[in-house]
């Protein structure tokens, strides 16, 4: 699972510059093709969302909803960066999950 993460600032910047963005009221998705046969995930939560406990909770919810919906219906070979908006700080798992699936469908990589 380690190779499935975007960690370095350089990798995040590459996705922001080269990628296409999709958004809804809770999340923003930047998506960019990579040269691998796997999808890599990056999650970013600004300090505007809340204190560290809230930011970490939002990150965990995004990662878990991605993990549980990662299946053979999703196209491979993309770098995905999810950015949480301020309104996501008081949402529950179902809201985050539906927003995430909505963005993946908008991007055309989830059937």
From Swiss-Prot:
<keyword id="KW-0819">tRNA processing</keyword>
<dbReference type="InterPro" id="IPR020568">
    <property type="entry name" value="Ribosomal_Su5_D2-typ_SF"/>
</dbReference>
<protein>
    <recommendedName>
        <fullName>Ribonuclease P protein component</fullName>
        <ecNumber>3.1.26.5</ecNumber>
    </recommendedName>
</protein>
<dbReference type="GO" id="GO:0001682">
    <property type="term" value="P:tRNA 5'-leader removal"/>
</dbReference>
<keyword id="KW-0378">Hydrolase</keyword>
<dbReference type="GO" id="GO:0000049">
    <property type="term" value="F:tRNA binding"/>
</dbReference>
<comment type="similarity">
    <text>Belongs to the RnpA family.</text>
</comment>
<dbReference type="Pfam" id="PF00825">
    <property type="entry name" value="Ribonuclease_P"/>
</dbReference>
<keyword id="KW-0694">RNA-binding</keyword>
<keyword id="KW-0540">Nuclease</keyword>
<dbReference type="GO" id="GO:0042780">
    <property type="term" value="P:tRNA 3'-end processing"/>
</dbReference>
<dbReference type="GO" id="GO:0030677">
    <property type="term" value="C:ribonuclease P complex"/>
</dbReference>
<dbReference type="InterPro" id="IPR000100">
    <property type="entry name" value="RNase_P"/>
</dbReference>
<comment type="subunit">
    <text>Consists of a catalytic RNA component (M1 or rnpB) and a protein subunit.</text>
</comment>
<comment type="function">
    <text>RNaseP catalyzes the removal of the 5'-leader sequence from pre-tRNA to produce the mature 5'-terminus. It can also cleave other RNA substrates such as 4.5S RNA. The protein component plays an auxiliary but essential role in vivo by binding to the 5'-leader sequence and broadening the substrate specificity of the ribozyme.</text>
</comment>
<keyword id="KW-0255">Endonuclease</keyword>
<dbReference type="InterPro" id="IPR014721">
    <property type="entry name" value="Ribsml_uS5_D2-typ_fold_subgr"/>
</dbReference>
<dbReference type="GO" id="GO:0004526">
    <property type="term" value="F:ribonuclease P activity"/>
</dbReference>
<dbReference type="GO" id="GO:0042781">
    <property type="term" value="F:3'-tRNA processing endoribonuclease activity"/>
</dbReference>
């Amino acid at each position: 699972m380690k190779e499935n993460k975007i960690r370095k600032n350089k990798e995040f910047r590459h996705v922001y510059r080269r990628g296409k963005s999709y958004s809804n009221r809770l999340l923003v998705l930047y998506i960019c093709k990579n040269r691998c046969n796997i999808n890599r995930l990056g999650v970013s939560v600004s300090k505007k969302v809340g204190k560290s406990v809230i930011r970490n909770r939002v990150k965990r919810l995004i990662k878990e909803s991605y993990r549980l919906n990662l299946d053979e219906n999703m196209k491979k070979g993309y770098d995905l960066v999810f950015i949480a908006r301020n309104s996501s700080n008081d949402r529950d798992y179902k809201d985050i999950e539906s927003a995430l699936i909505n963005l993946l469908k908008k991007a055309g990589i989830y059937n």
